[in-house]
Amino acid sequence: MAVLTVTYNTGETIRPFLASVAGASTAPVAVVIADNGSTDLDALRAIGESYGATVVSSGGNRGYGGGIDAALTALDDVLPDVRPDFLLVTNPDVVLGPGSIDELVRAADRLPGAGAFGPRILDEQGETYPSARQLPSLRTGLGHAAFSRVWPANPWSQRYWSTTQVVEREAGWLSGACFLIRTSLFRQLGGFDESYFMYFEDVDLGQRVGRAGRSNVYVPSAVVTHTGAHSTSSNRRRMEIEHHRSAYRYLSRKYRAWWLWPLRLVLRAGLSVRARWVTRK
């Protein structure tokens, strides 16, 4: 088993995550941390080593997906004897619940046709985060984008979030905050698409898992807690812009036929206006 994560000026906040790994799996776990250009890399190395983790530099700020891909490369280069059947991809501000990795692996053993497995993700208040959702379509995406903030209960957002079923089920995609994936499948897919700097890289991956003939499965019996988006909290405006940029990239690829160019134009304009609206001072 290998656990891959990415840091960017994370500092001491990674300790709870590292401390939770041992209790999440009864099997040996190799932890690889790819750092995206932190100013405190030496301190991070010391923290990682104290928990038996391997810390490597990704070579720059490659975003979340690029950082995870760098961590997998480092796993091959630095720990060549580690040949895991599964990878747990996770944010560094996640605390893994007791036995959570074991529970995801058990689900994978029960469901050989499935490729990726997502736990139930709780926020700091203990509320379930909607981490297993349907793939966004144009109708759902536009409705969600237009009304999610002013009318949270709108039918498009409800369909997008698919929050009502905290039961084991298939989903279109799983949150990149924490999920288990078969190593062979992740390699087959070429890892994350690094053109998504941040946001929608998990949506894209979930779509490609489905296209490869595998399913994404929500496994709520495995529980983790997402303690907060540390690396994004310092620059919310930039992250909102990145979110809208990635949304356009995903939808423009989904509706890429040449005769849909007017639709892509409207999408770009609409998302640009929304980005300016939500980032206004």
Give short role names for the model-derived ranges.
Residues 207-281:
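Active-site-adjacent helix/loop segment of glycosyltransferases
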Residues 136-171:
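Short, flexible, basic/aromatic active-site loop/helix in glycosyltransferases
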